[in-house]
From Swiss-Prot:
It catalyses: 2-C-methyl-D-erythritol 4-phosphate + CTP + H(+) = 4-CDP-2-C-methyl-D-erythritol + diphosphate; 4-CDP-2-C-methyl-D-erythritol 2-phosphate = 2-C-methyl-D-erythritol 2,4-cyclic diphosphate + CMP. In the N-terminal section; belongs to the IspD/TarI cytidylyltransferase family. IspD subfamily. In the C-terminal section; belongs to the IspF family. Gene3D superfamilies: 2-C-methyl-D-erythritol 2,4-cyclodiphosphate synthase (3.30.1330.50), Spore Coat Polysaccharide Biosynthesis Protein SpsA, Chain A (3.90.550.10). 4-CDP-2-C-methyl-D-erythritol 2-phosphate binds at residues 232-234, 258-259, 280-282, 285-289, 356-359, 363, 366. The keyword Transferase applies. One of its GO terms (biological process) is isopentenyl diphosphate biosynthetic process, methylerythritol 4-phosphate pathway. It comes from Sulfurimonas denitrificans (strain ATCC 33889 / DSM 1251). The gene is ispDF. Its cofactor is a divalent metal cation. PROSITE patterns: ISPD, ISPF. Pathway: Isoprenoid biosynthesis; isopentenyl diphosphate biosynthesis via DXP pathway; isopentenyl diphosphate from 1-deoxy-D-xylulose 5-phosphate: step 2/6; Isoprenoid biosynthesis; isopentenyl diphosphate biosynthesis via DXP pathway; isopentenyl diphosphate from 1-deoxy-D-xylulose 5-phosphate: step 4/6. It comes from the Bacteria. Its EC number is 2.7.7.60, 4.6.1.12. InterPro entries: IspD/F, IspD/TarI, ISPD_synthase_CS, MECDP_synthase, MECDP_synthase_CS, MECDP_synthase_sf, Nucleotide-diphossugar_trans. This is Bifunctional enzyme IspD/IspF.
Length: 386
């Protein structure tokens, strides 16, 4: 015999459902450099952990994830979902996503509700077809006071996501000019109906750092060290100044390059990108883009460091080998270490600079330019130690 929920789920398969996961928020209330959607659960970022759990239920015909364009470029390395650029508000992100929805129903949730499990999804979906929106909620157990008056807490609900909506009803509701904080409120304001069902505490939303302690479904990030190697060369130019390792070098030459030609910083950028799995310097700072003409390589490195933190990486150490017949850099090593460490946000002892020659071999040996090999090690930010 099938029970009611099983029969309801079997009936739900007669309907098509798209899952929208909203991940375009700035995490401004999270108070860390890392965006919460990039916290790691094992080796996976939080958004992928949530999407994968939902996908494995088999309930959804399509999965859409909203985020910023920068995030989307990196997200594509993890999974083949439909990614949509988010808007300035949650509602605008939802509108953008709905342009890609052609299923009868849509389930909308926030990636920050990371402990949504199959049982909870099954419960929500089992109510498909009963109203324009299915809304999970939690009861209030504390006394509620508004404007110095005590409110009957039996009349107050803590509304959660995910919420299941009839797609046509939600699209119509969002044509209104008002801003709504959840889907069902928009649908009801537009004359639609909603059904409340009891939610679950484990669907708590990560908003503040302390919320992480409430989520038992999340395992710690992997402790693996991620390593990358970068290599770059630049020929000398008899015009301009020489910048190497983030500092100005006393030399009769500069470097022939699109930017300021700091070959050591360029190799380091590639090493960091390699460790993070984020491509290469040509992808992030293309040399055919006029905005990088004459660019200060220190600023490019600083931009990358911000991105690495944003995506949940911590720089462990870097090691840079400079191969050159000239200039002699022995007296510049400490200044390079201090400058690079200040940009990376790590202690100077974690930045190593080595110099070598090529024993007069090749273009470096002929004094035509400089080559650099850089190594970088990263780890995932460990949010369990906050």
């Amino acid at each position: 015999m099938y029970n009611f929920v099983t029969l309801s789920i079997l009936g739900a398969y007669l309907h098509t459902i798209t899952l929208i996961l909203l991940a375009a928020g700035s995490s401004s209330r999270f108070e860390l450099d890392i965006k919460k959607q990039w916290l790691r659960v094992g080796d996976r970022p939080l958004w992928h952990f949530v999407a994968d759990r939902c996908e494995k239920t088999g309930y959804f015909d399509k999965i859409i994830i909203t985020s910023s364009l920068d995030d989307i470029e990196f997200m594509k390395n993890y999974a083949d979902y439909t990614f949509v650029e988010g808007g300035q508000t949650r509602q605008q992100s939802l509108k953008n996503s709905l342009l890609h929805v052609d299923t009868e129903y849509v389930l909308v949730s926030d990636v920050a509700r990371s402990c949504i499990d199959e049982a909870f999804l099954k419960k929500i979906i089992s109510h498909v077809g009963k109203s324009d929106a299915v809304v999970p909620y939690l009861n209030i157990t504390d006394t509620i006071v508004y404007d110095d008056k005590t409110i009957d807490r039996e009349r107050v609900k803590r509304v959660q996501t995910p919420q299941l909506s009839l797609t046509t009803a939600l699209k119509s509701a969002l044509l209104r000019e008002e801003e709504f904080t959840d889907e069902s409120s928009a649908i009801v304001a537009n004359g639609g109906s909603r059904e409340f069902i009891l939610g679950q505490e484990s669907a708590h939303k990560i908003t503040h750092i302390e919320d992480l302690k409430k989520l038992s479904c999340l395992s710690a990030p992997s402790s693996d060290t991620l390593s990358g190697v970068g290599f770059d060369v630049h020929a000398f130019d008899d015009k301009g100044e020489m910048f190497l390792g983030g500092i100005k070098i006393d030399s009769e030459y500069g470097f022939l390059a699109h930017s300021d030609g700091d070959v050591a910083i360029h190799a380091l950028i590639d090493a960091l990108l390699g460790a993070a799995g984020m491509g290469d310097i040509g992808m992030m700072f293309p040399d055919n883009d006029v905005k990088y003409k004459g660019a200060d390589s220190k600023e490019l490195l600083g931009t990358l460091v911000t991105k690495l933190r944003h995506f949940g990486f911590v720089i462990v150490n870097v090691d840079i080998t400079i191969a050159a017949e000239k200039p002699r850099i022995g007296n510049y090593k400490m200044a390079m270490r201090k400058k690079i460490s200040s940009i990376l946000g790590i202690d100077a002892q974690r930045v190593n600079i080595k110099a070598t020659t090529t024993e007069k071999l090749g273009f470096i040996g002929r004094g035509e330019g400089v080559g650099v090999i850089a190594n970088a090690n990263l780890k995932y930010f460990d949010w369990t130690k906050i």
